[in-house]
From Swiss-Prot:
PROSITE patterns per record: IF5A_HYPUSINE
Domain of life: Archaea
Organism of this sequence: Methanosphaerula palustris (strain ATCC BAA-1556 / DSM 19958 / E1-9c)
Pfam families (UniProt xref): eIF-5a (PF01287), IF5A-like_N (PF21485)
Gene: eIF5A
Locations listed in the record: Cytoplasm
InterPro entries attached to this UniProt entry: IF5A-like (IPR001884), IF5A-like_N (IPR048670), NA-bd_OB-fold (IPR012340), Rib_uL2_dom2 (IPR014722), Trans_elong_IF5A_hypusine_site (IPR019769), Transl_elong_IF5A_arc (IPR022847), Transl_elong_IF5A_C (IPR020189), Translation_prot_SH3-like_sf (IPR008991)
Protein name: Translation initiation factor 5A
Keywords: Cytoplasm, Hypusine, Initiation factor, Protein biosynthesis
GO cellular component: cytoplasm
Described function: Functions by promoting the formation of the first peptide bond.
GO MF entry, a single one: RNA binding
Length: 125
């Protein structure tokens, strides 16, 4: 899910949607309005799920989408290779999630982990 907001209301550390990917804002630089133009904002972001750095330039008054990012808790049911089967502790739904190299030591069967969910995608936190 996502909601709409203006570029001028965004801040560092928040999230926005760029190229249909939820991204975390690394930095925002705004320029002064010129004689015939509106103020522009240059926004540097990094994808939450793909890790790709992106940069966009848009007018401060333009509209953009902000993803709803939720952190949830789950229990590890099983591990096979680099995939883990998790069960959400509130909804009791089962799903599989890829284990990244930096999280391999933290994931054990029976242990609770936190994960990020946004726009239908999930990632270990």
């Amino acid at each position: 899910m996502k909601e709409q907001t203006e570029i001028g209301k965004l801040k560092d550390g928040r999230y926005m949607v760029v190229d249909d990917q939820p991204c975390k804002i690394l930095g925002i630089n705004t320029s002064k309005p010129g004689k015939h133009g509106a103020a522009k904002a240059r926004i540097d972001v990094v994808g939450i799920f793909d890790g790709v750095k992106r940069s966009i330039v848009q007018p401060v008054s333009a509209k953009t989408y902000v993803p709803i990012v939720e952190r949830k808790a789950a229990q590890v049911l099983s591990i096979s290779g680099d995939m883990a089967q998790l069960m959400d502790l509130k909804e009791f739904t089962n799903f599989e999630i890829k284990i990244t190299d930096d999280k391999k030591n933290d994931v054990e069967v029976g242990k609770e982990v936190t994960y990020i969910e946004s726009m239908g995608m999930r990632k270990l936190d």
